[in-house]
Design a protein with these regions (language model features):
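Conserved alpha/beta-hydrolase
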Residues: 31-53
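The serine-hydrolase catalytic nucleophile loop
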Residues: 19-31, 46, 170
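Hydrolase active-site cap/lid region
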Residues: 99-139
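Short beta-strand/loop motif that positions the catalytic acidic residue
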Residues: 152-153, 157-160, 164
Length: 220
């Protein structure tokens, strides 16, 4: 789903988490907030999630990178866009977004509740969810070194809940420490993994909007 704004605009691609969808309240609110501020916003479902085709059991880091690359390719043929794009990724969506940015010209990123080591947090995810995935997910995940991929990467904002029950805040700090300026770090007190409470969520959206304006909109 492409939310357009008035005039030519940079795009913010929203990448949802491992078992989430593009229609989560979080991403609907992000699109609603960003579009009037000079951004086109894209929401999409990774394969096997929400309205997409495929089976969640076939999900891997590699498959999600391929899905994201397909979205970027699609946008390159759309009119009314500047060609510059940012990524706002939540949890596994942030992980995938960072890996994509390591090999592609992403202008800026904001990653929420994002792990630096997917395998280390698997035990914190509900067992019923993890059982939906094949062994291939874990084999594929071992191929990727997120901290190595983002070492020296600029223009990334890291947001994390201090009460995240899935991804320890220390993983967010490790990501931030690996980055290069300009970068930003925001720890949200009392916020959970989904940043589900109204006040922290509003704070996160406001902070991300300000970050993307600074990085992508001249004069802001």
């Amino acid at each position: 789903v492409l939310h357009r704004c008035t005039g030519e605009a940079p795009v913010i691609i929203c990448c949802h988490g491992l078992f989430s969808t593009m229609n989560s309240d979080k991403f609907l609110k992000i699109a609603e907030t960003f579009a009037p501020e000079g951004f086109a916003v894209v929401r999409f479902d990774f394969g096997g999630c929400g309205e997409s085709t495929g089976d969640i059991a076939d999900t891997t880091v590699t498959s999600r990178l391929e899905d994201l690359e397909a979205v970027v390719q699609y946008l390159s043929g759309e009119g009314g866009l500047t060609g510059r794009y940012g990524i706002l990724g939540s949890s596994f969506g942030g992980y995938v977004g960072l890996l994509h940015a390591a090999k592609n010209p992403v202008a800026a990123l904001s990653v929420w509740a994002t792990p630096c080591d997917m395998l280390s947090i698997a035990g914190n995810i509900p067992k019923a969810d993890m059982q939906k995935l094949k062994r291939d997910f874990f084999i594929d995940a071992r191929r990727y070194d997120l901290l190595g991929a983002v070492a020296g990467m600029p223009s990334v904002q890291v947001l994390h809940g201090a009460s995240d029950e899935i991804v320890p805040a220390e993983q967010a700090r490790l990501i931030y420490q690996a980055l290069h300026d300009p970068r930003d770090f925001l720890l949200l007190p009392q916020a959970d993994h989904s940043i589900s409470q109204p006040s922290p969520r509003k704070q996160a959206i406001t902070a991300s909007l300000a970050w993307f304006k600074k990085q992508l909109l001249p004069g802001c």
